[in-house]
Amino acid sequence: PTYPSWNLEISDLTRIDVWLEEFREFEKNGKLPQFQIICIGNDHTQGTRAGSLTPRAYVAQNDLALGRLVEAVSNSKYWADTAIFVLEDDAQNGPDHVDAHRSPAFVVSAYTKRGFVDSTMYTTSGMLRTMELILGIPPMSQYDAAAMPMFNSFTNKADLAPFKALPARMNLEEKNPPNAPGAQRSAQLDFSKEDAAPDIEFNEIIWKAVRGANSQMPAPVRSAFVRAVDDDDEEEEEREARRERQ
């Protein structure tokens, strides 16, 4: 109940401190819930708003918070029976070179393949379906029922070695100067709730903050995902449709 909700003025490290306090109590009393949702969302950042943390500092705090969470769980008595799924809430229409819908995703478990990059095309629904299968619950909708579970990320041999969070390699309190690229526009944007800022404009502000004021952000790429149909199959489907109409 004391876990801070959305507020970019509260560090994700503070959020993890609150979560850790409760998690240690669960370790003592054995009452850890079967399923938890943990939001550490300050990697949204406030762009280059003067005086706020830089995008680099916000993301570094977020990374360290996640690392501390994984370290705590992997060193706990629950590790052998736990999987941690990490996903952005929204791809934000970013300048990904393959498709603007793509998001980085991580699965951390004693039963995931370590050091493995799974290039299978999964969806958010597929991640939900994987959680449902682990928990032994039915799909919530037709979308997760039909989605590909993340089978390829897992193995049947456990590696119980714990993880250790790496220390931050940059200043976690780095602030935006008044003359940062996009500072004036960032001051006008609404950060009181998630994803209220125009995504492409905000992406460009962050891009220039990280890559340099004179750098050019690539335009978003939007790929089409279609089911390939053999010509013979298509003709058979048309014939079947005509028979049904008759």
Identify the function of each model-found stretch.
Residues P1-Q246:
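N-terminal pro-sequences and low-complexity stem/linker regions of secreted or lumenal proteins
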